[in-house]
Amino acid sequence: MIKVYGVPGWGSTISELMLTLADIPYQFVDVSGFDHEGASRELLKTLNPLCQVPTLALENDEIMTETAAIALMVLDRRPDLAPPVGRAERQLFQRLLVWLVANVYPTFTFADYPERWAPDAPEQLKKNVIEYRKSLYIWLNSQLTAEPYAFGEQLTLVDCYLCTMRTWGPGHEWFQDNATNISAIADAVCQLPKLQEVLKRNEII
């Protein structure tokens, strides 16, 4: 069985949602506190020297990291969780899958730990990065239609990102006021019976 090393509510939530949608069994291993010295960090370091979550230990003992790579792995088993090959939605799915981790993810690295990157002006860095993140979400919102999911009636793995990331900064109210498509998609995903246990355990709902 796959082991998902993560922290409730963090990026590992996205992987949990993907695996749950795909009916792939897994065991969650809580490594809360991994971002500081201690037992959790030492455990995670033995699997992933970069000490990032999610880190997945697969059935064959190989290690998988990076949520976009995990999504591609899931699609090998459940291709129906992406738009069909040959449709325009497929290209947008591929683009947004990479865009999210290449553009939005780094803003959390800098805004969550600003003192690491700008020790002389951490609050200014945090403020600037959060404003930049908002501009990214506004662009992303313009690419989506929420009918009811990111690519229409078909639920895809990109929806797992939107559902989870809405709970991170700048928060639910901001999305409701400024990124209504993202907010509506997240609401639709949060209503899926299949995901209730994972969503509650990760305090998404």
UniProtKB/Swiss-Prot annotation:
Family matches, as PROSITE patterns: GST_CTER, GST_NTER
Keyword tags: Transferase
InterPro entries in alphabetical order: Glutathione-S-Trfase_C-like, Glutathione-S-Trfase_C_sf, Glutathione_S-Trfase_N, Thioredoxin-like_sf
Binding site for glutathione: V53, E66, T67
GO cellular component: cytoplasm
Gene3D superfamilies: 1.20.1050.10, Glutaredoxin
Swiss-Prot/TrEMBL GO biological process terms: response to hydrogen peroxide
GO molecular-function terms, A-Z: glutathione transferase activity
Source organism, top-level taxon: Bacteria
Domain GST N-terminal: 1-82
Domain GST C-terminal: 86-205
Family: Belongs to the GST superfamily. Beta family.
Name of this chain's protein: Uncharacterized GST-like protein YncG
UniProt organism field: Escherichia coli (strain K12)
Lineage: Bacteria, Pseudomonadati, Pseudomonadota, Gammaproteobacteria, Enterobacterales
